[in-house]
């Protein structure tokens, strides 16, 4: 009987279609359009077979000896279920080959049991670390992570957020480099899905933001160089039209200002965060004969490019030029000499953001999260400068 039920639907629909399509001479006509219809029927039949043979939640409950409601609680992670009962349910699921239909459940509940993540780009170690930790943290909450990128364009970042909202993500985490604060607030207020912003401070949505003190971290790096006797300090920026780029440059300026060092605009080179640009900008500094004893690169990739330019010019690190990076990339400790840099706790930031997003999704109360701070990682690329034995306040600015 089971075999008959399995095979019967394969033939009956096709027979009906063919008998309805006899030509005038009584012969069967099978034009291309009909063949397409028969293929569709065949596909529908295969789906029917799978559904006919697929184990259901009721089957699991009968095999485990528990109610269907208990199986549902185990699958959804809701309610109180004894561990022994949970194991019974999981054993029954494995024996029956049961797979929950998450798509059907999401349509019924208007959720997807997933967290969306929008990043500016997939390039670089920074985003690799962020994605890895985001995936792990999402899994600890029993949810899936859906990731998309904004192609370094605010319009596409906005579209990505809307796409994830349309997919009924429980919450969305947005890492944006370029989106304006006005657009961020528009999304927070218009998108029904809870939205958490990382690496950006939005004053009107303090409980939705998880960010670094970028300016303070850059200030610490340049302040350290000054404390080591450097006053002629050059700076290579990351894109200045981004909040991160502006904040790191401001940290550089504030450190000089604190020590009464006059800002020399010739020592500031505006970059794009890449190794090639770091190499080119450092060559410009050398070619223009701008005097400097230390170089602050606003990310480690640019510092790496600068190190090659210095080497080609016959300048030694740190004997001739001290070099300080930012982000503490994995490559920093493998440079020769090892690169001093600023470490930002990316892992802690994304874990906090995921947790905050899930609290919002559950309509739990949330509070503003204090900003994360950077830590100086001191290695071998910095040595004392010409003013090391003098007080900063008494040294003449260059």
Which stretches of residues belong to each language-model region?
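Short, solvent-exposed amphipathic alpha-helices that sit
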Residues: 88, 126-140, 217-221, 243-262, ...
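N-terminal helix-turn-helix DNA-binding module of bacterial transcription factors
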Residues: 5, 9-11, 16, 20-21, ...
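Flexible loop/hinge segments that line or gate small-molecule binding clefts
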Residues: 152, 174-220, 261, 301, ...
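N-terminal helix-turn-helix/winged-helix DNA-binding helices
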Residues: 52-56, 94-132, 140-141, 151-152, ...
């Amino acid at each position: 009987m089971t075999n008959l039920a399995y095979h019967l639907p394969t033939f009956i629909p096709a027979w009906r279609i063919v008998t309805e399509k006899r030509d005038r001479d009584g012969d069967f006509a099978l034009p291309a359009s009909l063949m397409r219809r028969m293929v569709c029927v065949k596909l529908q039949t295969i789906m029917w077979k799978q559904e006919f043979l697929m184990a259901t939640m009721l089957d699991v409950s009968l095999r485990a000896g528990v109610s269907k409601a208990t199986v549902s609680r185990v699958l959804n992670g809701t309610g109180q279920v004894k561990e022994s009962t949970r194991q019974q349910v999981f054993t029954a699921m494995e024996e029956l080959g049961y797979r929950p239909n998450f798509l059907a459940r999401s349509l019924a509940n208007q959720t997807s049991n997933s967290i969306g993540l929008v990043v500016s780009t997939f390039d670089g170690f920074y985003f690799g670390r962020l994605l890895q930790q985001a995936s792990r943290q999402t899994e600890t909450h029993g949810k899936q992570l859906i990731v998309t990128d904004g192609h370094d364009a605010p319009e596409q970042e906005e579209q990505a957020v809307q796409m994830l909202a349309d997919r009924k993500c429980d919450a969305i985490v947005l890492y944006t480099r370029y989106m304006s604060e006005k657009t961020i607030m528009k999304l927070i207020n218009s998108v029904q899905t809870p939205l958490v912003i990382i690496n950006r401070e939005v004053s009107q949505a303090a409980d939705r933001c998880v960010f670094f003190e970028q300016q303070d971290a850059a200030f610490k790096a340049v302040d350290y160089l000054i404390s080591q006797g450097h006053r002629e300090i050059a700076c290579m920026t990351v894109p200045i039209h981004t909040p991160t780029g502006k904040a790191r440059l401001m940290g550089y300026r504030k450190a000089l200002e604190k020590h009464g060092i006059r800002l020399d605009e010739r020592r500031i080179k505006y970059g794009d965060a890449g190794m090639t640009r770091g190499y080119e900008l450092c060559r410009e500094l050398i070619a223009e004969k701008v005097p400097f004893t230390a170089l602050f690169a606003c990310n480690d990739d640019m510092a790496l490019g600068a190190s090659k330019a210095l080497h080609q010019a016959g300048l030694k690190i740190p004997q001739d030029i001290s070099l300080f990076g930012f982000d503490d990339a994995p490559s920093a400790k493998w440079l020769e000499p090892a690169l001093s840099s600023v470490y930002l706790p990316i892992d802690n930031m994304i874990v906090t953001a995921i947790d905050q997003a899930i609290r919002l999704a559950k309509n739990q109360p949330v509070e503003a999260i204090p900003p994360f701070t950077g830590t100086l990682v001191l290695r071998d690329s910095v040595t004392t400068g010409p003013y090391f034995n003098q007080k900063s306040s008494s040294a003449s600015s260059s």
